[in-house]
């Protein structure tokens, strides 16, 4: 078989629309819990009928994750921007644990040496779940093994468990924390010192009052007291703060204090290992622990009344969360990939625009550019603030889609853009709430906004690629529990090439996110650089 490329007329602008969390559920038995199926989507219906479309892979080995693991927005945008399969950090860390190199990593052993010298305590902080979007529970198990290997016993290892419920079942936390405590008991080392939901500990939108609750819990023991982690979780399940905050994500500050004991908190001379490997939801709590008093005083958003920085605290992070953070990094980022989409387009002297709302802004900029903090030449970034007047987006499923659309239309009208990357967060962020009716409204809002961008782009002589980074809102009922499904899916996602030249011509099947950048370049009339292993989806198999 030979792959023959169908040459495209150069288009300007070429617009890549990422409908975040909009997947294709292949099983009709879930139609009544499929927001994409239930929504009124005249734009998507029209595009699918008139232009070539295909399903592409967004999970597992197709995006550099373990087989069967769902994709996520960070991984998805990095793969899209790279034009190649990107080996993800979860794989690097897991390999290091399996080959034992993790246990001799100098940053890891440095934490052990620090507490032995100071007489302090080792703390394990992280999202305790098997979602493998932000963390992997098995990496936490490895830290317990690390403590045992180095002679720590009992509460010389304190675990601060952040519960998930967003990338996992809303009530899976009890199982995950039980796995931790069982391993601690079998190993003779480790106790759970605190439990709190990711809604608080993993904020990324400068809602510092949430981070304050987590920080005060871990440093002062501030929160409701329970005799065990399981008791804390079960209590919240029975008494959520409100109906829209049901499940692990929203568990309030819980200090675990056995009868006759006292809270175990982070103190001077201690060491903290933060096991999360994804950076966007770790930065705020990390800065609270590590910024000196002067830096904390000037922190964006105002921070909170933290008090003085904890003295002599060894703080290590599984990966590099942000350039310049005053932490020890266990696994440094690999060298930057050359000739990613943004860099390659910039090298041609072309203008590009990236746009998303706050929730997905890092994804179309930082992650899309392989963890680069600054734009390339002729690369412009635009952000629409995500709504701050609601605590969960089911209360405002339209989010900031209209604001994003206006910014993109302005760029198209200006005539200066060669490439535009836009993310609509609604399908993913509202899908995470598990509220079907709201997810339907989210899909409908995105569909309407996409229609406006499509019309303006075609009128300007451009073309579009309409797709997603992963699925979510096409599965709103959990197949195992029958309750709300709040996590991503492993389903494929649609990709539509909206270009008059390709009407009636099939797209190549079996594609993945790595093929999107080459597809965009082909529409722009540019050669695909050799570093990109993805191929344009306008290639077809011939005899």
Swiss-Prot record:
One of its GO terms (cellular component) is cytosol. Mn(2+) 1 binds at residues 428, 432, 488. GO terms for molecular function: manganese ion binding; phosphoglycerate mutase activity. Mn(2+) 2 binds at residues 20, 73, 469-470. Its cofactor is Mn(2+). The active site is at 73 (phosphoserine intermediate). One of its GO terms (biological process) is glucose catabolic process. Binds 2 manganese ions per subunit. SUPFAM superfamilies: 2,3-Bisphosphoglycerate-independent phosphoglycerate mutase, substrate-binding domain, Alkaline phosphatase-like. Pathway: Carbohydrate degradation; glycolysis; pyruvate from D-glyceraldehyde 3-phosphate: step 3/5. It comes from the Bacteria. NCBIfam families: pgm_bpd_ind. Monomer. Catalyzes the interconversion of 2-phosphoglycerate and 3-phosphoglycerate. Belongs to the BPG-independent phosphoglycerate mutase family. This is 2,3-bisphosphoglycerate-independent phosphoglycerate mutase.
